[in-house]
Amino acid sequence: MECCAPVIGEILRLMYESTFSRVANAIKFKSNVKALNESLERLTELKGNMSEDHETLLTKDKPLRLKLMRWQREAEEVISKARLKLEERVSCGMSLRPRMSRKLVKILDEVKMLEKDGIEFVDMLSVESTPERVEHVPGVSVVHQTMASNMLAKIRDGLTSEKAQKIGVWGMGGVGKTTLVRTLNNKLREEGATQPFGLVIFVIVSKEFDPREVQKQIAERLDIDTQMEESEEKLARRIYVGLMKERKFLLILDDVWKPIDLDLLGIPRTEENKGSKVILTSRFLEVCRSMKTDLDVRVDCLLEEDAWELFCKNAGDVVRSDHVRKIAKAVSQECGGLPLAIITVGTAMRGKKNVKLWNHVLSKLSKSVPWIKSIEEKIFQPLKLSYDFLEDKAKFCFLLCALFPEDYSIEVTEVVRYWMAEGFMEELGSQEDSMNEGITTVESLKDYCLLEDGDRRDTVKMHDVVRDFAIWIMSSSQDDSHSLVMSGTGLQDIRQDKLAPSLRRVSLMNNKLESLPDLVEEFCVKTSVLLLQGNFLLKEVPIGFLQAFPTLRILNLSGTRIKSFPSCSLLRLFSLHSLFLRDCFKLVKLPSLETLAKLELLDLCGTHILEFPRGLEELKRFRHLDLSRTLHLESIPARVVSRLSSLETLDMTSSHYRWSVQGETQKGQATVEEIGCLQRLQVLSIRLHSSPFLLNKRNTWIKRLKKFQLVVGSRYILRTRHDKRRLTISHLNVSQVSIGWLLAYTTSLALNHCQGIEAMMKKLVSDNKGFKNLKSLTIENVIINTNSWVEMVSTNTSKQSSDILDLLPNLEELHLRRVDLETFSELQTHLGLKLETLKIIEITMCRKLRTLLDKRNFLTIPNLEEIEISYCDSLQNLHEALLYHQPFVPNLRVLKLRNLPNLVSICNWGEVWECLEQVEVIHCNQLNCLPISSTCGRIKKIKGELSWWERLEWDDPSALTTVQPFFNPVREVPLLIADATTQML
């Protein structure tokens, strides 16, 4: 028995455990059901979270993918089995619950095991699928280049600004746009976790835009695998999901040639993913605009010092040697700061020690000759991509700009007139319409970085390398572009072998030609443009030379010393459209022009002709005549001008000839009534003899004009920004004329040395008629009877404030010169000016002026942007009511104060003008406070004497530190008292 005891004990133990387990399972039936339901829900969710992105990722790892597929299959089976058992337990009786409970526990164990394996899969896939935040992009850095560093800083500022969701980086080919954004990308990588983006994606787009290829680059950074058979739409959805998971992303699209629809690529809109940004680089500003960028950063060429350093880096130490350095610097400068050109030329000259070789290269570059093949391949071919992108019309317009010398600022109107003469501008009805179309083309070429702003207003120029490229196109072409360009090269003579029958354009302008050769008649049979202007030594143009160009459309002899022009009947220039003889100051007479049947433009500005050109009245297509600055023009025969039926522009600005009304003029001379007969006239600039014209309100033909400049009285010109329709009255008693009818059409009025202004103003006020078109008013050399003003002020101000007439409701500019006002308020109150639109005030040599606004005047001038005051000895302040609670000029951008010895203050202590950008204070020694604080973030330049700057007192001590970098000291010279200028002119 004793030996059986252990066996019996074990049997009883097993029976107890089995029974206990059954009882326990029966008791825990409900809890087991609940636990299985919860685990089953987690497993189902886990299986669903094994996203398509994870599956496609694992195609790179076949064994791992097989394990995942097996897990998913097992999970599916267990989930199905568990759901089936859970359904069965509903109909399970109490007696069967222990068995059912045991089965549920078994399935629960399987579910938990699969759940554990699934979690391990997810963790492993999360590690595998997490892309590097920023990948290094190989390339040189620009961090040590001044200009590039500034542009990089602008982009970085944009990345931190909530207003800049999309940033455009644009510039000409080879200027370094890609290098700039590569540097940005790599700087972000160096910053690691401190940079703000969860993911930075650098994508190369290129000219041949392939949406699929761009999507593939983005998908690769997101570790999304792409399938050949997968549609762009489906891939876009997966990219969208991937990017939306990122906290913030930065997408850099490099080399964009056409606008891209980011939605079609799957890029979330920036408002959907706050803080995310898109940067794109393009050669074309228009692409940036089309893609609705919020900030556009133009990449400019390198500064000279940075360009030299880059050249040295590529050319080697030889360029620093004494015998090469000077000529090497000149070669570097010929590259115009364009990095691509600097690298190409520098590399080609690397290690070259022979000075003659360097001189040869410099000579070739200065003549726009590609002296090595790599210049064509590495510089011109990339630029040709931009050129090929242009429409044919724009290509011709671009090439024509290369006819001008290197670094030449081209007048936009001049080049557009060339385009019009060549037939590049469509016939849009009027010359002004065609001119506007041409200006639009100029702007588009600027947006393509093929033209840039010139040194003067309304001019453009070509970058040296771009011009070399254009000349390369023209010289190597044998089609309609084939041209000879030798402008600005110091040429002293032109040989016949330089010319060829295939040439379409010939530019010999700005040289030292003294004579021109006789050529074979009709030798250059295709040449339509011949530019000879700027040859100051040229005294004669032989008939034999011009006869070689029978198809000329444009002939420019401006700035030469020719005394006469060959007989037009002998020249047979039957296709000539435009003849430019501007500033031929020796030219006193022209032959009859009646045989130039297609002539539309004649420019005689600055010539010494004595009489009106003959034969123009026979030309049915003639549209533009420039007789400005013809200081010796004395005669215009009657009934000639009225026959110029197609004339659209008559410019006689500063001409000696003065027009008179019928009955006043000398017998046989033209009268102003003839001008009224010109139904197509749109632009007119003339000088009228005296006031009778102003008395004739029947001259309503004035309202047909789109532009006019009428000078009544003595010759007087003062340019403003609103000269579109300008009336100048000089040395007349204006109380004897009625100008109200003319002011209705006028945008700018100038009164110089006029009497009776008080009476004229009184009449205008009493007529209760404002002039809404007038935007600029100039009053100069006028003594005003202030007693009369008081009377007129009381007349106007006696009305209810709402009834007070604002005589000039849209006035934007006001110029006062040598006017004896004590305050600007006198003029403002007298005319009832509310000054709501005034942008510019310019006051000079008003010796009695003590303040702008007096104590009675508490108004602000809300839109005033510029104040310029000089030589006003009595001026003490700008506003007498210095305790006014807000700046009276809240939007002032430019403040220029010169030679104001008694000026003490311009603002309250501590007052800040937040919009100030430019300040100039010269010889204002008592002024010791500026309305500037450390919050003035728009300041660009402050100009003044160093001694004055050091005496300034600052309410905000940190303001000095903030604006000190923008201070430009001027040379201190004694105050000049302009006695001569105080005399009435």
Swiss-Prot record:
The keyword Nucleotide-binding applies. ATP binds at residues 171-178. One of its GO terms (molecular function) is ATP binding. It comes from the Eukaryota. LRR repeats lie at residues 502-523, 526-547, 551-572, 575-597, 598-620, 621-643. Residues 24-88 form a coiled coil. Gene3D superfamilies: Helical domain of apoptotic protease-activating factors (1.10.8.430), P-loop containing nucleotide triphosphate hydrolases (3.40.50.300), Ribonuclease Inhibitor (3.80.10.10), Winged helix-like DNA-binding domain superfamily/Winged helix DNA-binding domain (1.10.10.10). Disease resistance protein. The LRR repeats probably act as specificity determinant of pathogen recognition. This is Disease resistance protein At4g27190.
